[in-house]
């Protein structure tokens, strides 16, 4: 969903994986369903290239995704070709989210953010946290700790956790992997690739309101972070970017007496 195209429209970019370079032909069928499974729209498009872009517009009575009423819609995609049939189902929500000098606004309404960092590790099982535990963590953050935003410290986290955040209305600040270190050019190129992989995997989650494109608590590096920001905004023009810098090795360290981190928005 693209905010700039209006909350009543859906803009879809579907990329087809074609490693064998087969001749492209056939049809793509898209069905949009509401939270009760009712079909709101059915569209059919001819396949002529690996990237297919289309719009479903003039939708009426659309309900917004919000932290108190996280309404989700489903877009079912079928690809029918001479080589077979494939399908994909994605949930999403209609919402706008924006950080301004006057604060954060969700669907045009001011919202004071109360958030925590979250690692998806657990005693005895490490990072191999299953679906039910991922769900439970999201619920603890939302209902027991009463926060409205979670920062994925410091890496993209399980799809099960993000799915539950979508379902219960918990906002997400999702980060690329890393902590206090910036490596050489090869390392930096891999981090930029991580930005792309994170966004392309998770861009349909309405809970995600901010892409974290800085290595956590890392020193300043204008060239590197210009590239991570450019990658994020090229892939997703609907979300802002952010990150956490390390003051003691940053440009503004003389202005502070501690090495506390500061959140940045770009």
Residue spans for each PLM region:
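Active-site loop signature of alpha/beta-hydrolase-fold enzymes
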Residues: 119, 179, 263-266
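Secreted/periplasmic carbohydrate-active enzymes, especially glycoside hydrolases
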Residues: 5-156, 163-164, 169-172, 194, ...
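Disulfide-stabilized cysteine-rich extracellular repeat microdomains
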Residues: 97, 121, 246, 262-263
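Substrate-binding/catalytic cleft of secreted carbohydrate-active enzymes
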Residues: 139, 149-258
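Single conserved hydrophobic/aromatic residue that forms the stacking wall/gate
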Residues: 1-11, 256-266
